């Protein structure tokens, strides 16, 4: 499912005047994917909070949530049996969609960096990512097609996330094999695994990659530590918030990682 969707999105972006290379395809697909993934993550957290009788406050304000601007759904019984389908009457498209993304959405997301209480928060990371990005999809109609394709995807199970990560890895590797500079973000996974095993990091260490690229080393280190022992609640919090750091000078790597 993911592979065919990526191919369809590449075909859409190929005809857009703002996207001239495979690097552009990856970057522009990635920021839309990130916002869809963030929306799914917030839904999971809200559900978990509800099951424990707790309240959950969304990171993203309602106006800027995926289900509001990107993929509003028909929820009324008057929808003629189409509940859950895209509401074409309220979904932005064309110039309206482009203007919303460029004038409202991106500036809103960039502000998260300045407003965050620390660099360890997800708010800071959102702001950091969108401070380095620009929407290059010039046609709002093409952007609408991309959004519709991505909205069909689900990455809420381990298997779905695993498939997505492997497809991304192959895409980055292929850019390198084709002689494009996207290959600088790719190190073969077996080599990364070997290096991490030799270094043998421990929970409590600070792990920093000064040329983080697509974060392959950090992801592999996380996976290694996650399976190194039975984790306590404190260990999990340490891994999620106080262990991994990276720096990259090029904007593409932020969103790929």
Please place each PLM-identified region on the residue numbering.
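Conserved S-adenosyl-L-methionine
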Residues: 182-257
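Non-catalytic, mostly N-terminal accessory regions of nucleic-acid modification and defense proteins
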Residues: 1-203
